[in-house]
From Swiss-Prot:
The keyword RNA-binding applies. PANTHER family: EUKARYOTIC TRANSLATION INITIATION FACTOR 3 SUBUNIT G. Residues 1-35, 157-200 are annotated as: Disordered. One of its GO terms (molecular function) is RNA binding. Component of the eukaryotic translation initiation factor 3 (eIF-3) complex. RNA-binding component of the eukaryotic translation initiation factor 3 (eIF-3) complex, which is involved in protein synthesis of a specialized repertoire of mRNAs and, together with other initiation factors, stimulates binding of mRNA and methionyl-tRNAi to the 40S ribosome. The eIF-3 complex specifically targets and initiates translation of a subset of mRNAs involved in cell proliferation. This subunit can bind 18S rRNA. PROSITE patterns: RRM. It holds the Pfam family eIF3g. Residues 210-288 form the RRM domain. It is found in: Cytoplasm. Keywords: Cytoplasm, Initiation factor, Protein biosynthesis, RNA-binding. InterPro entries: eIF3_g, eIF3g_N, eIF3G_RRM, Nucleotide-bd_a/b_plait_sf, RBD_domain_sf, RRM_dom. It comes from Aspergillus clavatus (strain ATCC 1007 / CBS 513.65 / DSM 816 / NCTC 3887 / NRRL 1 / QM 1276 / 107). This is Eukaryotic translation initiation factor 3 subunit G.
Amino acid sequence: MSRLGNRADWADDEEFDDPSALPPQQVTTNKDGTKTVVSYRFNDEGKKVKVTRRIKTTVVREHVNPQVAERRSWAKFGLEKGHAAGPSFDTTSVGENIVFRPSVNWRAQAAEAEKAGGEKGSIKDQLKDKKVKCRICSGEHFTARCPFKDTMAPVDESTGAAGGEPGAEDEAAAGGLGAGTSSYVPPHMRKGAASGGERMAGKYEKDDLATLRVTNVSELAEESEIRDLFERFGRVTRVFLARDRETQRAKGFAFISFADRSDAARACEKMDGFGYRHLILRVEFAKRAT
């Protein structure tokens, strides 16, 4: 019996080492108030890694309303009964504190804002499906913002001029307005107004003689590439590549303005029929305002 009592049990062996066991975490308090935490873990390769972290604790004191502090200590009730103290992230969102100060006539202001918002919304719905079209180059932008408004005539003006001059009957009718009476006749309806306006239309003759229209352009083309193609023949002052407003891809045509007409003529001769991005370019002079 004495021999059995002195025999050590294998379960009481404290020196048994498990190769997969990790050493316990060690926390050391430093003199400066920080804590050094040493822990161990296994990395992705299965090797034991030692991790040392130094933690500094900072106490932030906040002065709040005593009633607010008291409400925070209340026990939760209702659907939140039994939950931990503090806001729950699934039911509470913490945001900026906004101070609401209603004015005296806030009802009238709210009614006016609602009315204005309804009118804007209706106008927006009406113009939602409408697209802006330039009258000069047929691009999807306002005519006033067209880069070629000073070099090309609008489409309606060019087509109207091609139809011929107004007849004598129209001139007589326009000139006869207000004859013998004191009624007012608008300047554009007076006799000779059309011819005078045509003589004054010098803005369309500024540099339209040196502007080329390029068609059959790839939808993947870029303005810089087109400029590089045509700058070989002379100084290019402006390049406009029409793009789709939604997809931002080229619409198939572009305008190139040269500083000298001779350079534009040479570029038109060389680049007409030129292969670019698997397409054959069609180059011609832009229609001049008549």
